[in-house]
């Protein structure tokens, strides 16, 4: 009933507002329906649907998601044009009703619009929170939590273990200690993260596709769910902030180095800065949400891929155990010697992108793009998942072959547009070093200590590598 009412309302609105627009030279487009545009062509795995459409209509496609014009990029050359040549023009973010509610009307770094406020916040994240020096200062936190992970696995040796839960726990503990100073709060925000990541996925609210009809989200109950989740986030973050402020007032904040303390110092040093309490809470939620979800997901895919490919597992075990011979554990100083480990991590992130379409961008102005007319306000989806499986760029792209990265110049830092696990340009992920420091240390120590088998006599071909799509690509 609600959906029928919605369609009738949109149809009437279209008739009343119909007007001629100058013809533009747009990229090729699949046939679209009135009102909904191309939404019916996007299945539960958007990266698959868009890749299949691109094979027919080309690496640049013009789509319509409801009233929203969308440019879909599915080639390395086109990705370079967006992320490098026209990076500033495509530096904005589209409006997201969910993100707007959760992140205090756009005060975070990931989803905020491209403004002077965003530039200041991004600078703080890059120079104060995620600099090489700062990431290195958290080495003890990483090593302590990885030691606990290894101990937990040892305590369950010869038993069936749930690696997913253990990886979420170790990642959550690292990110939580670094962000708020304590790993005890992981359980408080873990469920919230999963709920919000699901709501931020590509099956978004009606309001995002039809801004005039946001009331439909109220009828379907989505708005209530978002409000409840946003309140849970704020209650959690407000508690964290009050604890830190109380400790600082009583001079008990002894050499605190967590992100909340750093941001409070910035706030105190410049009372007129953009760093108000809502900004602090938004940035901390960015770190907690993006850090925990993406790192644990990448780790799960990597270990699953190694278990499913025993030849690669054996090569990595030989390398790690040779370098770690006579040691009880692998230290961060050892990681730089492990070339096959680095190749494994790169190959895992090529096949199993945690963000297969990156976070959508939006054009800030009209632009002539690769011969086509792209209007201001066009949403841009870069199908990095499809680019990384392009057979013209990668030999046997569907196979897990870490060897392809040995003696290769290709890296994950955003300069090779055939391989963009962290994005690139102004909107590229600033947490690359933080994420890889955790990823490599966890995998190296787990492989150093343990051999893995599937439970109950399962065969390798039975290992389910199905993905669950959302804003991140989690293993089923």
Swiss-Prot record:
The chain crosses the membrane at residues 1-18. InterPro entries: Cyt_P450, Cyt_P450_CS, Cyt_P450_E_grp-I, Cyt_P450_sf. GO terms for cellular component: endoplasmic reticulum; membrane. Optimum pH is 7.5. Keywords: Endoplasmic reticulum, Heme, Iron, Membrane, Metal-binding, Microsome, Monooxygenase, Oxidoreductase, Transmembrane, Transmembrane helix. The keyword Oxidoreductase applies. Psoralen possesses photocarcinogen properties. It intercalates in double-stranded DNA and cross-links pyrimidine bases under UV-A irradiation. Psoralen is widely used in combination with UV-A radiation to treat a variety of skin disorders like psoriasis or eczema. Gene3D superfamilies: Cytochrome P450 (1.10.630.10). One of its GO terms (molecular function) is heme binding. Coiled coil: none annotated. The keyword Iron applies. Its EC number is 1.14.14.141. It is a single-pass membrane protein. Signal peptide: none annotated. Belongs to the cytochrome P450 family. PANTHER family: CYTOCHROME P450 71A2-LIKE, CYTOCHROME P450 FAMILY 71 PROTEIN. Involved in linear furanocumarin (psoralen) biosynthesis. Converts marmesin to psoralen and, with much lower affinity, 5-hydroxymarmesin to bergaptol. This is Psoralen synthase. It comes from Apium graveolens (Celery). The lineage of its organism: Eukaryota, Viridiplantae, Streptophyta, Embryophyta, Tracheophyta. The gene is CYP71AJ2.
């Amino acid at each position: 009933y609600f959906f029928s009412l919605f369609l009738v309302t949109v149809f009437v609105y279209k008739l009343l507002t119909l007007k001629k627009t100058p013809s533009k030279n747009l990229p090729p487009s699949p046939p679209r329906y009135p009102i909904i545009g191309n939404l019916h062509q996007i299945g539960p795995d958007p990266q698959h649907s868009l890749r299949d459409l691109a094979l027919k209509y080309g690496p640049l496609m013009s789509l319509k998601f409801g009233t929203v014009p969308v440019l879909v990029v599915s080639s390395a050359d086109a990705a370079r044009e967006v992320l490098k040549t026209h990076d500033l023009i495509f530096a904005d973010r589209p409006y997201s009703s969910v993100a707007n509610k959760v992140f205090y009307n756009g005060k975070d770094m990931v989803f905020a619009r491209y403004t002077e406020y965003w530039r200041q916040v991004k600078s703080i994240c890059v120079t104060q929170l995620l600099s090489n020096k700062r990431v290195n200062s958290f080495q003890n936190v990483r090593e302590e939590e990885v030691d606990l992970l290894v101990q937990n696995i040892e305590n369950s040796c010869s038993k069936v273990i749930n690696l997913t839960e253990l990886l979420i726990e170790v990642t959550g503990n690292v990110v939580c200690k670094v962000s708020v100073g304590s790993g005890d709060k992981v359980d408080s925000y873990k469920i919230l993260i999963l709920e919000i990541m699901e709501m931020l996925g590509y099956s978004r609210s009606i309001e995002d596709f039809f801004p005039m009809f946001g009331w439909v989200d109220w009828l379907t109950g989505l708005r209530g769910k978002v409000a409840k989740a946003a309140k849970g986030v704020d209650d959690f973050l407000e508690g964290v902030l009050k604890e830190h402020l109380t400790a600082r007032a009583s001079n008990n904040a002894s050499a605190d180095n967590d992100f909340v303390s750093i941001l409070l110092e910035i706030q105190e040093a410049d009372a007129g800065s953009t760093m108000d309490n809502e900004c602090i809470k938004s940035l901390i939620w960015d770190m907690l949400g993006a850090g925990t979800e993406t790192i644990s997901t990448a780790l799960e895919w990597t270990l699953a891929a190694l278990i499913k490919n025993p030849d690669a597992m054996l090569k990595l075990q030989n390398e790690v155990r040779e370098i770690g011979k006579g040691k009880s554990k692998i230290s961060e100083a050892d990681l730089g010697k492990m070339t096959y480990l680095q190749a494994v991590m790169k190959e895992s992130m090529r096949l199993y992108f945690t963000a297969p379409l990156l976070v959508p961008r939006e054009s800030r102005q009209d632009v002539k793009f690769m011969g086509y007319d792209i209007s201001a306000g066009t949403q841009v989806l870069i199908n990095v998942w499809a680019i990384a499986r392009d057979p013209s760029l990668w030999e046997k792209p569907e196979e897990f072959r870490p060897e392809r990265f040995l003696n290769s110049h290709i890296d994950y830092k955003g300069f090779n547009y055939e391989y963009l696990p962290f994005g690139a340009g102004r909107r590229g992920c600033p947490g690359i070093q933080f994420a890889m420091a955790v990823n490599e240390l966890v995998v190296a120590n787990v492989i150093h200590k343990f051999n893995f088998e599937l439970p109950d006599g399962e065969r390798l071909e039975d290992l389910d590598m199905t993905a669950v799509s959302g804003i991140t690509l989690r293993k089923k």
